[in-house]
Design a protein with these regions (language model features):
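Conserved Lys-Pro-Asp/Glu-containing loop-to-beta segment of HAD-superfamily phosphomonoesterases
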Residues: 102-129
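Non-catalytic pre-domain segments flanking phosphatase-related domains
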Residues: 1-30
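Short, well-ordered beta-strand core segments
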Residues: 28, 71, 94, 138-140
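Acidic, Mg2+-coordinating phosphoryl-transfer loop and its flanking beta/alpha structural elements
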Residues: 120-153
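Asp-based phosphoryl-transfer active-site loop
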Residues: 22-40, 132
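Basic, amphipathic juxtamembrane/active-site segments
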Residues: 40-63, 142
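Short, acidic/turn-prone active-site loops that include or flank metal/cofactor-
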Residues: 97-102, 143-146
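Substrate-recognition element of Asp-dependent hydrolases with the DxDx(T/V) motif
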Residues: 61-85, 95-96, 132
Length: 153
């Protein structure tokens, strides 16, 4: 069994391209399934769903908050696993089971006094598209739906 640590350094050209990209961003709206997880669901014989969350994503959200960017979860699913992960990260802004993610996002923007240009959105699938196209900065994971990747900055 290998004990080698993963290589986490970003290529210098990517860092140079990112300079100034987040200027003016005050909040980050993120989906959960497919963004904080790998998108897979494991279902037990009793119907209980299990998800895998990556610790690096959680660390990134904590760093955003420490940097003054408000992390906001807007997820279409509601599950004990998602609520637990959000609570473990200490995030206080989240909407669970959002049938209309755009309406949920509008509520958060109004509550926090934000405009779309001040918001980054991280989404991976069709329900995230209305948010991604309005965001001041749109992001999508590498394994996101092609349409989500196409609108990402």
């Amino acid at each position: 069994m290998s004990t080698a640590r993963p290589h986490l350094q970003f290529p210098p050209e990517l860092l140079l391209q990112a300079q100034g990209v987040g200027d003016g961003i005050r909040a980050a709206i993120f989906d959960v399934d497919g963004v904080l997880t790998d998108g897979r669901l494991f279902i037990s014989e009793h119907g209980e769903a299990f998800k895998a969350f990556h610790v690096l994503d959680g660390h990134g959200l904590k760093l955003l908050a420490q940097g003054g960017i408000v992390p906001i979860g807007v997820t279409g699913r509601d599950s004990p696993a998602v609520r637990r992960r959000v609570a473990d990260l200490g995030l206080s802004h989240a909407t669970y089971g959002a049938g209309d993610k755009l309406a949920a996002a509008h509520e958060w923007l109004a509550r926090l006094g934000l405009a779309w240009g001040e918001v980054a959105v991280i989404g991976d699938d069709w329900p995230d598209l209305p948010l991604l196209v309005r965001a001041g900065f749109a992001c999508a994971p590498a394994n996101a739906h092609a349409e989500a990747r196409a609108v990402a900055h």
